[in-house]
A protein has these predicted regions:
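Iron-sulfur cluster-binding electron-transfer modules in prokaryotic oxidoreductases
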Residues: 1-304
């Protein structure tokens, strides 16, 4: 279906963006551009990456946005893990984490998503299951369990907890690998000024707001903290699609704070936030760039 969508988007696509949707969909692109669907999803491109033979393996849970819109983020993660002597496995059976279904009250659908992902992610003997999307990380680590508990599906809880014990967010894992001496940063780097946006799930549920900042600082970036760095960008998954009239002013406040920081690059750990903020800045013809932390670190880390 997404391959068909890639072809169908062509009349609306300009570069990496869809800037205008027609008719009843126009509200979605009135205040921000949307990312174009990638020509090839990560689940395909990752097969073309020549990974070194490694004793240790991790499973990468991509999530929908990285898989189908931003495969370059996943490719950057593979590059970093390989430098640490870790092979990245992409379990083919992974699907949506179920967060949109759960937040819409469709718990039965969310439970099916959870079971599908548990089966896929526990099929390989891996040290960690890593995600570069905080919303997905929260789903895998916490919400699969709470969904099964809410539905009384107690038989599914042991494997959900087994998965939760392996789940870790990208920045926390990289920080751990650096602290263990398995990765190191290039010396003497002065990479300029950036600003950092805290995704809601990363800071408030995973409590991992300092790890990315520490990594970016170690890499050689000067972080110009924006005002209200931890205020929501207005994305909120399907929230921004269903309630654009509320999402738009929240995004505008974030964009003002980014511009006022004086940085020409805004970095964040959430592909959903990248989609929202990059799309908003593009709509305003801003020269400020937006990237995921994984992309900023991929070329600055070396094997120890």
């Amino acid at each position: 279906m997404l391959r068909a969508a890639y072809v169908m988007q062509k009349p609306l696509q300009k570069g990496n963006f869809i800037r205008h949707l027609p008719f009843f969909l126009s509200d979605m692109t009135e205040f921000r551009s949307l990312p174009a669907i990638a020509e090839a999803p990560l689940r395909d491109t990752i097969k073309t990456i020549q990974q070194p033979a490694c004793k240790e393996k991790i499973a990468f849970y991509a999530g929908c946005l990285i898989d189908f819109a931003y495969p370059e983020m996943g490719e950057a993660l593979v590059k970093i893990m390989n430098k640490a002597g870790i092979e990245v496995v992409f379990p083919e059976g992974q699907t949506c984490c179920g967060a949109p279904a759960r937040y819409s009250g469709a718990y039965e659908v969310a439970a099916q998503n959870a079971n599908d992902n548990i089966n896929a992610l526990l099929a390989n003997d891996v040290t960690y299951v890593v995600s570069a999307c905080p919303t997905c990380t929260v789903a895998l680590k916490h919400e699969f369990i709470s969904t099964f508990e809410s539905l009384g599906q107690t038989d599914s809880l042991p494997r959900a907890r087994q998965l939760a014990d392996k789940v870790i967010d990208f920045s926390s894992l990289v920080k751990k690998l650096v602290d263990e001496g398995r990765l190191k940063f290039k010396e003497g780097q002065q990479l300029g000024k950036i600003t950092y946006h805290d995704s809601c799930h990363l800071k408030r549920t995973l409590h991992a707001s300092q790890e990315p900042r520490q990594l970016l600082t170690q890499a050689g970036y000067e972080i110009a903290e924006m005002y209200e760095a931890d205020m929501c960008c207005g994305m909120g998954g399907t929230y921004s699609l269903k309630l654009p009239e509320i999402s738009a002013p929240i995004l505008e406040r974030k964009l003002v704070n980014i511009k006022n920081s004086g940085a020409t690059l805004a970095v964040m750990d959430c592909p959903g936030c990248v989609m929202q903020i990059r799309g908003g800045l593009d709509k305003q013809n801003s020269t400020v760039r937006v990237e995921h932390t994984v992309q900023r670190l991929a070329d600055e880390l070396e094997s120890s």
